[in-house]
Amino acid sequence: MQTTGALLISPALIRSCTRGLIRPVSASFLSRPEIQSVQPSYSSGPLQVARREFQTSVVSRDIDTAAKFIGAGAATVGVAGSGAGIGTVFGSLIIGYARNPSLKQQLFSYAILGFALSEAMGLFCLMVAFLILFAM
């Protein structure tokens, strides 16, 4: 049977590993003073802690780009809904005016209010689509 001491990895072996494979936890383990004081003579300088930079692969960037386009397309659907809402508002204005011409001014003011709200929602959806595409 092997003892637990034989399973431990020596600090020299850990230092000789590739920098990309050293994890931040092991880097903090290596930066303890008792391990640095027992450095072999062949290591000329102090132990350099490996820094991991944020790197993305080509596949990950492609997935992010596809997600941007899907999100922007979903936000653009709201612009089409705005167009349908504007058509409904003015269609209802025509029907209401045909039924009761004496309410022309009140119906027109409600139609303008409905148009403004519908157009505002469409512009908001378009703004979100542009934010998804160009700000993220």
UniProtKB/Swiss-Prot annotation:
GO BP, one annotated term: proton motive force-driven ATP synthesis
InterPro entries: ATP_synth_F0_csu, ATP_synth_F0_csu_DDCD_BS, ATP_synth_F0_csu_sf, ATPase_proteolipid_c-like_dom, F/V-ATP_Csub_sf
Signal peptide: none
Modified residues annotated as N6,N6,N6-trimethyllysine in this record: 104
A UniProt-annotated Pfam family: ATP-synt_C
A GO molecular-function descriptor: lipid binding
Catalytic activity of the protein: H(+)(in) = H(+)(out)
Topology class, membrane: Multi-pass membrane protein
Alphabetical UniProt keywords: CF(0), Hydrogen ion transport, Ion transport, Lipid-binding, Membrane, Methylation, Mitochondrion, Transit peptide, Transmembrane, Transmembrane helix, Transport
Site (Reversibly protonated during proton transport): 119
Annotated PROSITE patterns: ATPASE_C
Post-translational note: Trimethylated by ATPSCKMT at Lys-104. Methylation is required for proper incorporation of the C subunit into the ATP synthase complex and mitochondrial respiration.
Protein's UniProt keywords contain Ligase: no
Cellular component GO terms held in the UniProt record: mitochondrial membrane; mitochondrion; proton-transporting ATP synthase complex; proton-transporting two-sector ATPase complex, proton-transporting domain
Transmembrane stretches, start-end: 77-97, 112-132
Transit peptide: 1-61
Subcellular localization(s) per the UniProt record: Mitochondrion membrane
Principal location: mitochondrion
Record-stated family: Belongs to the ATPase C chain family.
HAMAP family the UniProt entry points to: ATP_synth_c_bact
Function, in words: Subunit c, of the mitochondrial membrane ATP synthase complex (F(1)F(0) ATP synthase or Complex V) that produces ATP from ADP in the presence of a proton gradient across the membrane which is generated by electron transport complexes of the respiratory chain. ATP synthase complex consist of a soluble F(1) head domain - the catalytic core - and a membrane F(1) domain - the membrane proton channel. These two domains are linked by a central stalk rotating inside the F(1) region and a stationary peripheral stalk.
General remark: There are three genes which encode the ATP synthase proteolipid and they specify precursors with different import sequences but identical mature proteins.
Quaternary structure and partners: Homooctamer; the c-ring consists of eight c subunits forming a circle, and each subunit adopts a hairpin shape. Component of the ATP synthase complex composed at least of ATP5F1A/subunit alpha, ATP5F1B/subunit beta, ATP5MC1/subunit c (homooctomer), MT-ATP6/subunit a, MT-ATP8/subunit 8, ATP5ME/subunit e, ATP5MF/subunit f, ATP5MG/subunit g, ATP5MK/subunit k, ATP5MJ/subunit j, ATP5F1C/subunit gamma, ATP5F1D/subunit delta, ATP5F1E/subunit epsilon, ATP5PF/subunit F6, ATP5PB/subunit b, ATP5PD/subunit d, ATP5PO/subunit OSCP.
Illness: This protein is the major protein stored in the storage bodies of animals or humans affected with ceroid lipofuscinosis (Batten disease).
Protein name, entry field: ATP synthase F(0) complex subunit C1, mitochondrial
